[in-house]
Amino acid sequence: MQNKKSYRPNVAAVILSSKYPEKCEFFVAHRTDIRNAWQFPQGGIDEGETPEDALYRELLEEIGCNNVEILGEFPEWITYDFPKTARGKVYPFDGQTQKYFLVRLKEEAQINLQAFEIPEFKEYTFVKYDELFQKVTYFKRKVYRRVIDHFIKEGLI
């Protein structure tokens, strides 16, 4: 008999800089715990929390700022498996099922990666669309492209 896979409910934020729409740049951050792993902010949904509530909480925890405007929400939950080398190391899950939001930093937003005791990220940058997929960790590229291309198709980016 095969074991059923388990997936962690999660939210993820595709963050556009406050310069959008004049300049289209995506926020990506370098994880503190994994070498060369760049990604979007994301995190688990706590019991009783809505995905939108989790989004605001996770942004505050991970980048020290939830001063954003929500521009869109991906219509589906996207599930992906962790790489085999990572499974079971941090969470007892095989992967994550994620709800993606497209957000824009407000003009007065201030990012502070040191806002919490144990920082999730050590540095961040803003990149253009064509640079994004070279920068982010390999196993997230397909999902990121699907989500961003959807937002582009919908006219949100």
Swiss-Prot record:
Cofactor(s) this protein requires: a divalent metal cation
Keywords: Hydrolase
EC numbers: 3.6.1.-
A single BP term in Gene Ontology: ribose phosphate metabolic process
Transmembrane segments: none
Keyword Protease: no
Molecular function GO terms recorded: bis(5'-adenosyl)-pentaphosphatase activity; guanosine-3',5'-bis(diphosphate) 3'-diphosphatase activity
Sequence motif: Nudix box, positions: 43-64
The Nudix hydrolase domain, residue ranges: 6-149
Top enzyme class: hydrolase
InterPro entries: Nudix_hydrolase (IPR020476), NUDIX_hydrolase-like_dom_sf (IPR015797), NUDIX_hydrolase_CS (IPR020084), NUDIX_hydrolase_dom (IPR000086), RppH (IPR022927)
Gene3D superfamilies: Nucleoside Triphosphate Pyrophosphohydrolase (3.90.79.10)
Function field: Accelerates the degradation of transcripts by removing pyrophosphate from the 5'-end of triphosphorylated RNA, leading to a more labile monophosphorylated state that can stimulate subsequent ribonuclease cleavage.
Family of this protein: Belongs to the Nudix hydrolase family. RppH subfamily.
PANTHER family reported for this sequence: NUDIX HYDROLASE 26, CHLOROPLASTIC, UDP/ADP-SUGAR PYROPHOSPHATASE
Protein name in the entry: RNA pyrophosphohydrolase
